[in-house]
Amino acid sequence: MDSESQLLEGAVEKIGLIPRSIIRTINRFQQQLFPDAVEYFIQEFRVSRSQVLVSLQCLLTLIIIPLFIHFFAKTVFLTPCIEYVWNTYKTDIFLNSYQQEQALTEMRNFEEILYFDLLVQSNEEPVTQEGLPFTFLQHSQGSVDEEKTTAPITAYAVSNMGNPETATIAPQHLHGSVGGKLESEFRFTNPSFVGKNNVTGATTITAAIPLQKKLVDLAQSANKQSIAALTNLFADLLTLFSLIILFIRLKSQIIILKSFLIETFYSLNDTTKSFMLIFSTDLLVGFHSPRGWEIFLDFILSRFGLPHDENIILLFVATFPVLLDSVIKYWIFRYLNKISPSTVATYHAMIE
């Protein structure tokens, strides 16, 4: 208990009006005048070594244990449980409207690419019709009409891939509700089967299998994204809770770690400290920092499955860097100017 209290006393050093480097130099000079200076230096070396070991141990504990808890919880029980509950009790595959809009945009792009490929590869005359046209044959019950026509296929169809050659689907929204103007049933066929008598009483659509497979891929991808977002949310909350517990349990070690990091920073020369300050401020609140904050906020929203609102992102980018810049300037004026005035002078000289 006594050694720990001595270690804490050596780790915590109050900030005064006179720089600590001057006070430390005067104290060491006075201590060298006494006959027991050798024992004091040995004791000081032991305290310094213990401070380094405790700081490294505390730092590794704060890094390794939360990462291990996050990986173990996410892999072992969070992912299987959330996947089971989501696939069993949830009817929607989309977590929010932004995710649905992304899927629809990707589907429209795929329709345009598929339409372009059909125009390039087809020997028929190009058909100009709004949406993605497919050439199909209309059949009546028991008879075949040789007239060809076209009709667009929307991105709200949900496929039934039971047969690799023909698959029957109905126009539906991805949420599961029937929508659209078409209420008839579609039977998608392979282009090699068009014109044969294997389809009666239905509409045979040419080259619709790629579109059908793309719908299935988008639905599966959106479902996986929703499960991953919920898993990340609960795993990060559990990691944050474990980190709070570690901060409470390792309070004395964290004080030693904080003092060790501060002493390490102050032991650097003025040029190095000024360079680190300039690099940090330019990275966080510099001219090019808004784009970085946008990417960071976009990553956070995507990780937790939150909708992307441009107004919120722009408001955050416009206010948070300004607040952070004010805090950094206050810290430089209030604390660093008293502890190391030469560093502040070098910092302003490098900025100018």
Swiss-Prot record:
Domain of life (superkingdom): Eukaryota
Membrane spanning residue stretches: 52-72, 227-247, 312-332
Entry keyword annotation includes Plastid: yes
Catalytic activity: K(+)(in) + H(+)(out) = K(+)(out) + H(+)(in)
Primary site of residence: plastid
Localization per record: Plastid, Chloroplast inner membrane
Any one biological process term the GO annotation gives: potassium ion transport
GO molecular function terms attached to this record: antiporter activity; proton transmembrane transporter activity
Membrane topology: Multi-pass membrane protein
Entry keyword set: Antiport, Chloroplast, Hydrogen ion transport, Ion transport, Membrane, Plastid, Plastid inner membrane, Potassium, Potassium transport, Transmembrane, Transmembrane helix, Transport
GO cellular component, one term: chloroplast inner membrane
UniProt xrefs under InterPro entries: CemA
Family the entry assigns: Belongs to the CemA family.
Its job: Contributes to K(+)/H(+) antiport activity by supporting proton efflux to control proton extrusion and homeostasis in chloroplasts in a light-dependent manner to modulate photosynthesis. Prevents excessive induction of non-photochemical quenching (NPQ) under continuous-light conditions. Indirectly promotes efficient inorganic carbon uptake into chloroplasts.
HAMAP family: CemA_PxcA (MF_01308)
Protein name: Potassium/proton antiporter CemA
Organism: Oltmannsiellopsis viridis
